[in-house]
Regions:
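A short beta-loop-alpha structural element at the N-terminal edge
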Residues: 1-15
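A short, internal acetyl-CoA/4′-phosphopantetheine-binding micro-motif in the GNAT/acyltransferase core
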Residues: 75-86, 109-110
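Conserved GNAT-fold acetyl-CoA-binding loop/helix
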Residues: 18-46
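Conserved beta-hairpin
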Residues: 54-67
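Conserved beta-strand-loop-alpha-helix junction that forms the acyl-donor binding cleft
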Residues: 107-118, 133-138
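Conserved GNAT acetyl-CoA-binding A-motif
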Residues: 95, 100-112
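Conserved active-site tyrosine of GNAT-family acetyltransferases
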Residues: 120, 125
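Conserved acetyl-CoA pyrophosphate-binding loop and the N-cap/start of the following alpha-helix
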Residues: 85, 89-97
Length: 146
């Protein structure tokens, strides 16, 4: 079931964000200091608790929170599914729910994250000519629109 995220979900949300980012981005950014010293569950949970992000976040919860989508206006700001539950339709359910219930029209994807780009293309998004540097790195984000 897809529902609005609550404070009770914070630790699970942070856990998903930290571990999926480590698994997906470590080979792209090659920054172990960031991945294992800065990117930690407790600080991520605190950051989300101290902001209004939860007001814009949905989770996929079937008794276990397995994925999340963060929507800011027309943008899909984040979409992550726990590594243990990927390729089971959870990300697809989240993005299709967002497309149906929110005016989402664009997102940014890491240019070298070809798996996510293919996923978004399968859900009606296409690459544009717009790109920007990921802050503090030499890697680019590419804009995708639907």
């Amino acid at each position: 079931m897809i529902r609005k995220a609550t404070e009770k979900d914070l630790s699970r949300i942070a856990e998903i964000l930290v571990f999926v980012k480590r698994m997906k981005y470590r080979s792209i950014f090659q920054d172990d200091f960031y991945s294992f010293n800065i990117l930690q569950v407790l600080p991520v949970a605190k950051k989300y608790a101290d902001s209004d992000i939860l007001d814009h976040m949905l989770v996929y919860d079937d008794g276990i929170v397995k994925g999340l989508i963060h929507i800011e206006g027309n943008e899909i700001a984040e979409l992550y599914v726990d590594c243990f539950f990927q390729n089971k339709g959870i990300g697809s359910a989240l993005i299709e729910y967002a497309k149906e219930h929110y005016p989402v029209t664009f997102l940014w994807a890491i240019e070298k994250n070809t798996d996510s780009i293919r996923f978004y293309e399968a859900h009606g998004f296409h690459l544009t000519d717009t790109k920007k540097l990921q802050e503090g790195t030499t890697e680019y984000l590419v804009m995708m629109q639907r």
